[in-house]
Amino acid sequence: MNFDFLDILSREKEGNEKIKTCIQCGSCTGSCVASDGMSLSPRKLWRNVQMGMEADVMGSLGFWNCTTCGLCDKRCPRGIPLSQIMLSLREKFDRAGGSVAGITQTLDNLRKSGNIMGEDAANRFLWIDNLGLTEKERGELFKGKSEVVYFIGCVGALFPQVGGIPQSLVKILRKLKTDFSLLENEWCCGYPVMGGGKGADSLREYAEHNIAAIESKGAKTVIVSCPTCYYIFNKVYPKFIDKPLSFNVMHYAEYLEGLITDKCLAGSETKSVTVTYHDPCDLGRKLHITDAPRNILKGLSGVTLAEMRFSGEEGKCCGGGGNLEMTNSELSLNIASKRIGDALETGAEYLLSSCQQCRRTLQNAARKGRARIKVMDLLEFLLLRLEETGKEVAK
């Protein structure tokens, strides 16, 4: 036993000291979607931390299976930031020279290219080829100055499976005649570095680079389609600058909520459909944005929303967070499959989300399980309904 283990861990981050107040109620284990993949349940892990059983805790590696979804944080009666302490354990593991194959490769890619896939910067924009734009129209996407910047994020930019998300947002913004542009030199927001055991301070260069790129555009608003990017911009980046951000960061659901109204599809003859909505953990639970996506759906004629058993800030994770797909893809798929089961219970024809990674993870699980449900991002569904009516977006 190492009786200093608890004290050292408690001092690493503000709030960590609350682990000393854990009463072993088990709400964390009952809330954890990843506990099946842990040799020590969350409850047992925290007890071992309290008892100074450092070797057992660090040897279990269960902290790498945490999706950092934050449901345990929300339900803990003592208000212990458990997902934050999971990240502290990853940092301790990293400082001790430990490594995890999937994480190591991703961090190497980020160092070399500024994105998780190690791709050339130009490849972030291959999805634009399918928009059917003229050379002039394509060039306008990268104009020097604009009121709005669309920060795409690595998953939407580099995974063809979800290329429809940035395509849909660009189409909608162009319909709205929004003065917007993309960042030619966009980097990853940096979350995979923090989630990879390097700590929040490791995001400084990502913050400085992306903030400077946005400010060079003179933008007042940044729209994101990745909730994790949103979280990093609003909760982590401000720590590295001595003044407030000069621009407002919004998820696309917030931006479009006031623009997409019932006028869009009034009197339309589109087919009536039932949809269910999966709340991304970072957007719904951590940033408390649950109404905006639903208000957009309410503004679409012929659309009925059927809620899953766990929704809103109590929504279950898709299994795609916390770098889990890099460290334990099988567990990630199993978690996503359970969420598909929740969606099927509603009888909905569509399972919608507003996160690029959720869309990937859930669609992979639906295909694997041959589930009879269409997985789409809210943006893709919105554009589909607008195009079915042949009407312009109301503004």
Stretch-by-stretch model annotation:
Residues 1-14, 37-65, 69-71, 79-114, ...:
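Ferredoxin-type iron-sulfur electron-transfer modules in oxidoreductases and energy-metabolism complexes
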Residues 31-32, 75-77, 362:
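Cysteine-centered loop/knuckle micro-motif
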Residues 1, 21-45, 285-289:
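A broadly conserved sequence feature marking short terminus-proximal activation segments
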Residues 19-29, 63-73, 186, 278, ...:
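Residues immediately within or flanking Cys/His clusters that coordinate Zn2+
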Residues 157-248, 282-299, 303-395:
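Cofactor-cradling patches in redox/metallo enzymes
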Residues 19, 36, 46-188, 192-224, ...:
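Iron-sulfur-cluster electron-transfer modules
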Residues 252, 260-297:
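C-terminal amphipathic alpha-helical segment
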